[in-house]
Amino acid sequence: MQFDVLTLFPDFFTSPLQSGLLGKALEKAIASVNLINPRDFTTDKHRRVDDEPYGGGVGMVIKPEPIFAAVESLPVLSKREVILMTPQGQPMDQALFRELTNYDQLVLICGHYEGVDERVCQLVTREVSLGDFVLTCGEIPALTLINGVIRLLPGTVGKEASLIAESFSTDLLDYPHYTRPPVFRGLAVPPVLLSGNHQAIAQWRLEQQEERTQQRRPDLWQKWQDRQPSP
């Protein structure tokens, strides 16, 4: 999979793209990330990418010309999405990450200042948000999306079965995890996890998932309930 990221701050991505599973996935060519600075597509000597908003108002708006030029300079692979990072977009979730793994190319446009000129939306096939809040830049949600999608690609995570059992893969939160020692400062590992009874362990984990989800995320619990077959 190819990620083409339009960003005014390419250095923002340097460390995360070289670290952990993400760095290893890029080394193994499971995915590639191409960083494009819209300033390289400006035509004035000051390399200006923003201007004042028509109609007045606070802040600056990213101009359409460098964004159009940057996107149009990219090769077009067979299955491509052009995604604008914006607070007005579709909130990210695990289902979105899974859907995006079906594409060959994701072009990510990182907003900044007061946002991008509305005409940029003519290039866009999807708008995506990190959540119901405003950040200083679109690089943070873009990096989140890159991480969330790449970790689902075959070969990124060593034990791919762990992707099935983790939080949100079934609308349930993850169950509690324990490792050695069996007792730490008076806190003991639940006996069922030491029993060797795999059926009992699986049942305990499901019960813990259901309890956690019901208590912490009633919205997800309702989705889980709605998906269960009628008795």
From Swiss-Prot:
MF term (GO), any: tRNA (guanine(37)-N1)-methyltransferase activity
This entry's Enzyme Commission designation comes to: 2.1.1.228
> Principal place where this protein is found?
cytoplasm
Top-rank lineage group of the source organism:
Bacteria
Q: Where is this region: Disordered?
A: 210-231
**According to its UniProt record, where is this protein located?**
Cytoplasm
Q: What is this protein called?
A: tRNA (guanine-N(1)-)-methyltransferase
Source lineage:
Bacteria, Bacillati, Cyanobacteriota, Cyanophyceae, Synechococcales
